[in-house]
């Protein structure tokens, strides 16, 4: 059921690619994302019913060039910095968190493709800038060697952004064991024609617009060029050398670590959603009165003023944390390892990822706290705040925040020289 859309408006893309100043390009992309907000709010009920982004919204994001942000310029992309990507995603999530999740988890993996896969397949896969890829790192399907490639079998759940994806990036179990007895895994880039998208999304508490369907491989043939043996997506990096993308395009962002970037990605989605929640809270402050005497407009009530102000500070703190940490990620990626004591190693990757997870949970706390005073009408099914609340609850229960305590322990072990395992 993969939906496909044609290339974006040529004039818009030509204009974007002609912009040489990164700040100017960022401003243009952020403005395009902001311009979509009212459309996203209006389309949110339809997106939940469809369980993914409605085609007319997907078209608008295509026309704005937003899916091309991480794709190399050599292959039709814009090749922006992650800090720019973050600002755009936050603006999209202000409109609707589910559709932001759908968008972000399909657009984000263009960065990883250049990082991990051989340059020989980049032109074909990026396809002039049309590349989108859902991803899931749990190795729940198998790859068996055959002449010229591999046969894939199995089901992968929670493939967020898959309805419009041209590819899937994930991990397959290989025959045999590693020397230490652990299972062998491979990094897989599977074109959309190798799998079936299952109609099994839309029954969770929230994020029903995220297009997080399962996919099924049924004796699918995968050419050998799309699989990297014994490469674990969780740890696969090039900190001791140069990645295919970094070598080909001279962009160090294609040479960095990505467990941190994934957690940061989820953090920036929740920041945008929290701003959307505060926006809805503010609209009700203007139109509603307090529930106790003297029954004044909420904007005039000292308690509601405090509720609003406290929430705004917490969200702003979360956004600043995300922005500043992305700049640190970029600095580590662009500084030669060891220069000035900078090493983008597993320790730095883990620490940066912890910031993203903490922001996720902090934003959930903000939305929960506002819910206590917004009023019961806001929790009516179909109301904007009700949808944001459900989406944020679903995000808080995501597997990534569940890594929090283990990651905290790793920080202490790393600092005190204690082996992680």
Which positions does each model-derived feature cover?
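Generic structural signal for well-ordered, non-transmembrane alpha-helical segments
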Residues: 34, 268, 272-275, 279, ...
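C-terminal helix-coil-helix/basic helical segment that borders enzyme active sites and/or dimer interfaces
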Residues: 41, 45-48, 316-358, 368-376
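FAD-binding subdomain of flavoenzyme oxidoreductases
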Residues: 149-222
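Glycine-rich beta->alpha junctions and the first turn(s) of the following alpha-helix
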Residues: 205, 212-315
């Amino acid at each position: 059921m993969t939906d496909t859309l044609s290339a974006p408006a040529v004039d818009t893309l030509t204009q974007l690619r002609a912009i040489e100043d990164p700040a100017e390009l960022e401003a243009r992309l952020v403005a395009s994302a902001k311009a979509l907000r009212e459309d996203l709010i209006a389309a949110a009920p339809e997106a939940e019913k469809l369980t993914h982004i409605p085609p007319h919204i997907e078209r608008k994001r295509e026309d704005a060039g937003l899916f091309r942000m991480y794709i190399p310029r050599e292959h039709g992309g814009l090749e922006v910095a992650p800090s720019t990507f973050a600002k755009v995603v936050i603006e999209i999530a202000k409109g609707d968190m589910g559709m932001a999740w759908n968008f972000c988890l399909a657009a984000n993996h263009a960065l990883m493709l250049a990082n991990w896969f051989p340059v020989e397949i980049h032109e074909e896969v990026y396809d002039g800038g049309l590349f989108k890829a859902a991803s899931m790192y749990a190795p729940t399907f198998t790859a068996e060697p055959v002449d010229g490639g591999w046969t894939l079998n199995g089901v992968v759940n929670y493939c967020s952004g898959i309805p419009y994806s041209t590819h899937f990036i994930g991990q397959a179990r290989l025959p045999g064991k590693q020397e230490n007895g652990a299972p062998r895994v491979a990094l897989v880039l599977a074109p959309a024609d190798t799998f079936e998208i299952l109609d099994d999304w839309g029954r969770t508490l929230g994020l029903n617009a995220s297009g997080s369907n399962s996919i099924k491989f049924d004796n699918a043939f995968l050419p050998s060029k799309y699989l990297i043996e014994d490469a674990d997506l969780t740890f696969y990096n090039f900190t001791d050398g140069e990645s295919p993308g970094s070598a080909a395009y001279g962009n160090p962002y294609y040479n960095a670590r990505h467990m941190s970037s994934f957690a940061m990605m989820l953090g920036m989605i929740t920041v945008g959603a929290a701003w959307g929640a505060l926006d809805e809270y503010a609209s009700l402050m203007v139109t509603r009165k307090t529930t106790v005497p003297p029954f004044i407009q909420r904007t005039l009530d000292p308690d509601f003023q405090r509720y609003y102000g406290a929430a705004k500070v917490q969200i702003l703190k979360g956004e600043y944390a995300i922005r500043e940490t992305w700049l640190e990620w970029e600095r580590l990626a662009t500084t030669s390892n060891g220069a000035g004591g900078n090493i983008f190693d597993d320790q730095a990757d883990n620490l940066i990822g912890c910031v993203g997870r903490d922001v996720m949970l902090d934003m959930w706390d903000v939305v929960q706290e506002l819910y206590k005073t917004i009023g019961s009408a806001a929790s009516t099914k179909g109301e904007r705040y009700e949808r944001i609340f459900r989406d944020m609850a679903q995000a808080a229960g995501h597997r990534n925040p569940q890594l929090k305590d283990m990651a905290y322990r790793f920080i202490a072990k790393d600092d005190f020289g204690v082996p992680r395992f």
